[in-house]
Amino acid sequence: MWNKNRLTQMLSIEYPIIQAGMAGSTTPKLVASVSNSGGLGTIGAGYFNTQQLEDEIDYVRQLTSNSFGVNVFVPSQQSYTSSQIENMNAWLKPYRRALHLEEPVVKITEEQQFKCHIDTIIKKQVPVCCFTFGIPSESIIKRLKEANIKLIGTATSVDEAIANEKAGMDAIVAQGSEAGGHRGSFLKPKNQLPMVGTISLVPQIVDVVSIPVIAAGGIMDGRGVLASIVLGAEGVQMGTAFLTSQDSNASELLRDAIINSKETDTVVTKAFSGKLARGINNRFIEEMSQYEGDIPDYPIQNELTSSIRKAAANIGDKELTHMWSGQSPRLATTHPANTIVSNIINQINQIMQYK
């Protein structure tokens, strides 16, 4: 059976389909719907404070008794200068003026937020914890394992996958360059982040690690799931496929933009957050490209542009806000999450029946 393997057993799920923990875009209904359909729903906790995460976990538990996960951001060890911030504020001034916004006071609470997330995940006995942007400390991994929480890391290269396995991850997401949203990269060979496609990355990681590999990037339907399994993955993680679902927290602006875009419309940019992320190209990205080498690292840039993005989204201006999307938008639907999962399963079974 295509849906019975080490990953499904480890995560206590029926189908090896994981809904990506997209920060700011998941809802309890989305998470629970995927879990109730036999997959693994994941809370995107990246921007939550402690109370928000606790409330989200409690709400999900009201909607499902099945396994689910929480995705957290590992704090970045980045450096920045005051002149970088001053310059960026000057460059962003016209956008703020147009939207009647004040210059924000930057508050960096990454470390404290991450610590609180881990404490909450342990306290609430969340079954699965997923990491993006790196690998947590040995002590944090030990605490989570002692609480019998399964750990999933993210890798965009073979070296990152090896590092995840050595650190004690139970499974690894192999994030191909087709994936929408932030790149999970944390190692920089020759100071350049990896941009390896899913079909190339997955088998190369599978060949060098002993733990289950989860394919991610451009996977939208049963064909992509089955292809990933053929490549050696034991499961898939899907983001954009669920982002356009009726059950996600995506705005109608973003949902419509993805549904109406083409495979050639996305770019990878640091303009919005200071970390590379794939989204639909727009005026803000193009105008900020001239400052590409001077953009402060995450989370500074994320803080500096946050109010601009929110204000633009509120007035329906897709040219000044982030529009995260993978490279397979033509395959996106607005179906409820449970329908998306059942369609994937039916398509796989149909393909296997005729092979």
Curated annotation (Swiss-Prot):
Sequence positions that bind FMN: N71, Q175, G180, G218, Q237, M238, G239, T240
Keyword Cell inner membrane: no
One example GO MF annotation: nucleotide binding
Catalytic activity entry: 3 propionate 3-nitronate + 3 O2 + H2O = 3 3-oxopropanoate + 2 nitrate + nitrite + H2O2 + 3 H(+)
GO biological process, one term: response to toxic substance
Cofactor note: Binds 1 FMN per subunit.
Highest rank taxon of the organism: Bacteria
This enzyme's EC code(s): 1.13.12.-
UniProt KW Nucleotide-binding keyword: yes
Any matching Pfam family: NMO
InterPro entries xrefs: Aldolase_TIM (IPR013785), NMO (IPR004136)
Catalytic EC class: oxidoreductase
Key words, A-Z: Detoxification, Flavoprotein, FMN, Monooxygenase, Nucleotide-binding, Oxidoreductase
Family to which the UniProt record says this protein belongs: Belongs to the nitronate monooxygenase family. NMO class I subfamily.
Note from the entry: P3N is a potent irreversible inhibitor of the key enzyme succinate dehydrogenase in the Krebs cycle and electron transport chain. P3N has been shown to be a toxic metabolite to bacteria, plants, fungi, mammals or any organism that uses succinate dehydrogenase.
Protein name stated in the entry: Probable nitronate monooxygenase
